[in-house]
């Protein structure tokens, strides 16, 4: 597999029908079983989409992964010690993998899905979606802060039309 996870599969021809609360539980369990540390769901809001783009999926699933605090303690990076930037890149890749796996899971169930990986997710601004999905709150310094992990974690997302139930911010 690629460091950022598998390429998108083709969507299955038949939709599997379940209740929204059952899909919500399945989606969260799947992401957590595939390297995710946090999962939240929010209804899509046009404010999450950058100007010039259009996203039509009604839901956004945000997945977060924690970073290794020991590696972050090596700030600032230097020519002799490059572990901090390597850790950041490693965790962006780790955040991408559960979303790309989740994307393929949703496609295999007959629903539309698109994975968005950080740090630059083109059309999707993941920060407000993550706040609405209950992943964290916005800190004074502009970073997302999670109650358990603090600010050192990375996020990726999947937009989809699978029936879901949103989380509270």
What is the predicted function of each stretch?
Residues 1-42, 51-56:
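Iron-sulfur (Fe-S) cluster-binding modules
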Residues 37-169:
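Catalytic cores of enzyme domains
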């Amino acid at each position: 597999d690629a460091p950022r996870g598998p390429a998108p599969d083709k969507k299955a021809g038949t939709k599997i029908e379940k209740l929204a609360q059952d899909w919500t539980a399945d989606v969260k369990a799947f992401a957590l079983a595939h390297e995710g540390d946090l999962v939240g769901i929010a209804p899509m809001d046009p404010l999450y989409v950058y100007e010039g783009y259009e996203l039509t999926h009604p839901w956004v699933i945000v997945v977060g992964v924690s970073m290794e605090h020991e590696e972050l303690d090596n700030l600032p990076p230097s020519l002799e010690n490059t572990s901090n930037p390597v850790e950041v890149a490693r965790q962006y890749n780790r955040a991408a993998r559960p979303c790309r796996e989740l994307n393929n899971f949703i496609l295999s169930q007959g629903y539309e899905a698109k994975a968005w990986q950080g740090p630059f997710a083109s059309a999707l601004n993941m920060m407000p979606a993550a706040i609405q999905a209950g992943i964290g709150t916005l800190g004074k310094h502009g970073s997302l802060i999670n109650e358990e992990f603090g600010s050192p974690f990375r996020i990726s997302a999947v937009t989809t039309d699978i029936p879901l139930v949103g989380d509270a911010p």
